[in-house]
């Protein structure tokens, strides 16, 4: 009467495939799913070797703390803390899934230590804080030379990144229907990491530039209207802008604006996100406000959560110095 239900018998590769199918159904990015798959399969093969069986013969019910800990010890030796933590997270999610599906009685990942990872220092644009203003002003003046120049579009790309702190994938995922709210209280609904959504406030200067860009888009392609499902950011063929195109555009803007030497190594579009957060922090935005705006899941250890309302988050965003530049550009931009 008090006995446990028998465990569902399944080999590890089959369980991994079922887990990955669930991730795909939840619309996680292909890049994220691919990273999970690689880490799960590599550690799984190590675990099978330690157990003395082929990976196809390793049943999920035999995964225990000692075996997984041993597999991670082998896996960790040549790898960085970031890689180990990523694999740890992948396995923790897999084994939590296996428990929920009745393949395991409990998740053994508590027995597997994970390395402490130093918090990475932000990498905003170098200099005295004027680089973003120079970037916007020079691009607005037509500094970027291209076969098919489109200043209105370029300004919206840079402006949105600087006043919202969106990641590359988030910028590319914005549609016309993502923008809502009434005048003076506009917001962009963003789908971030892990499919989490957040609402980002935008102010009249960027609203005006978006409207001007959309008008130019209609004229450029001979259109009378755009559906709400249309991507906000497009290339010169009116196709949704892709990651490579976005990176190229931003790199070219840095170059022609003469600030490429102020972009730190390992950043490109992400430098604009770091610039956004750094300048707001300088103007007194709290850690919790920045966490909400950036879409982070936690605050750096040691910082207390600060109660924050939607109005306070908007006020923090309004302090972004990029808005002052965009306001001037919009006021003097005419129809160009």
What do the predicted segments below correspond to?
Residues 1-336:
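Conserved catalytic core of the tyrosine transesterase superfamily
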């Amino acid at each position: 009467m008090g006995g446990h239900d028998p465990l569902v018998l399944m080999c590890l590769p089959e369980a991994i495939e079922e887990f990955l199918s669930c991730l795909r159904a939840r619309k996680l990015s292909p890049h994220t799913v691919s990273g999970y798959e690689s880490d799960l399969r590599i550690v799984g093969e190590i675990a099978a070797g330690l157990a003395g069986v082929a990976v196809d013969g390793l049943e999920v019910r035999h995964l225990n703390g000692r075996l997984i800990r041993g597999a991670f010890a082998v896996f960790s030796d040549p790898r960085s803390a970031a890689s180990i933590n990523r694999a740890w997270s992948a396995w923790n999610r897999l084994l939590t899934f296996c428990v929920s599906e009745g393949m395991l009685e409990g998740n053994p990942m508590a027995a597997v230590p994970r390395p402490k990872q130093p918090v990475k220092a932000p990498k905003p644009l170098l200099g005295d804080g004027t680089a973003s203003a120079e970037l916007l002003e020079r691009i607005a003046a037509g500094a970027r030379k291209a076969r098919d120049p489109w200043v209105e579009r370029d300004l919206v790309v840079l402006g949105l990144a600087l006043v919202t702190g969106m990641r590359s994938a988030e910028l590319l995922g914005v549609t016309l229907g993502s923008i809502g709210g009434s005048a003076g209280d506009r917001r962009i609904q963003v789908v971030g990491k892990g499919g989490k959504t957040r609402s980002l406030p935008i102010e009249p200067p960027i609203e005006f530039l978006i409207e001007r860009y959309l008008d130019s888009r209609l004229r450029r392609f001979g259109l009378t209207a755009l559906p709400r499902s249309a991507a906000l950011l497009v290339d010169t063929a009116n196709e949704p802008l892709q990651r490579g195109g976005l990176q190229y555009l931003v790199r070219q803007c840095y170059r022609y604006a003469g600030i490429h030497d102020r972009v730190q190594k390992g950043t490109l579009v992400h430098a604009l996100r770091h610039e956004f957060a750094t300048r707001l922090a300088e103007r007194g935005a709290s850690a919790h406000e920045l966490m909400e705006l950036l879409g982070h899941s936690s605050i750096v250890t040691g910082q207390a959560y600060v109660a924050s309302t939607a109005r306070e988050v908007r006020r923090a965003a309004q302090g972004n110095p990029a808005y002052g530049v965009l306001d001037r550009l919009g006021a003097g931009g005419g129809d160009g």
